Amino acid sequence: MASRDTPPATSYAPPDVPSGVAALFLTIPFAFFLPELVFGFWVWTLVAATHVAYPLLQGWVLYVSLTSFLISLMFLMSYLFGFYKRFESWRVLDSLYHGTTGILYMSASVLQAYATIISEGHNLSHYYINVAASFFAFLTTLLYILHAFSIYYH
């Protein structure tokens, strides 16, 4: 009789996500979702609150921050509702998304900082708002990069 060897595994297990909302927000890498959303919200709100003097620069910042906010919100909802269990390559998708978003956010952060430097001599209140937007943009960049590495190594 021929021996029945089990075939090698050809798929990856879905990520082990803790059950419950509180447990989800307290474990790495999933704890990065809420700060990413909050600080990303502050970026596009602060940029939109100023007079957009440089539409090409700050338009890219608004596009990256708003799109990243919405897609990250969809990722969070998919973790909360368990949609990730249906896909085998969810961990790779999550890591690629957050890595790509970290790179795009870095470009947006540099452009926002440049727009802040240029606007220094104009309206002082808009300058301070641009400084805050630059700070939150760099902070959000760091969070997205940390999330990408932590989901990759998790």
UniProtKB/Swiss-Prot annotation:
The keyword Ribosomal protein does not apply. Residues 24-154 form the MARVEL domain. Keywords: Membrane, Transmembrane, Transmembrane helix. Its main location: membrane. It is found in: Membrane. It comes from the Eukaryota. The keyword Ubl conjugation does not apply. The chain crosses the membrane at residues 24-44, 61-81, 99-119, 131-151. It is a multi-pass membrane protein. GO terms for cellular component: clathrin-coated vesicle; cytoplasmic vesicle; Golgi membrane; membrane raft; plasma membrane. Signal peptide: none annotated. Pfam families: MARVEL. PANTHER family: MAL-LIKE PROTEIN (PTHR22776:SF24), MARVEL-CONTAINING POTENTIAL LIPID RAFT-ASSOCIATED PROTEIN (PTHR22776). Belongs to the MAL family. This is MAL-like protein. It comes from Mus musculus (Mouse). The gene is Mall.
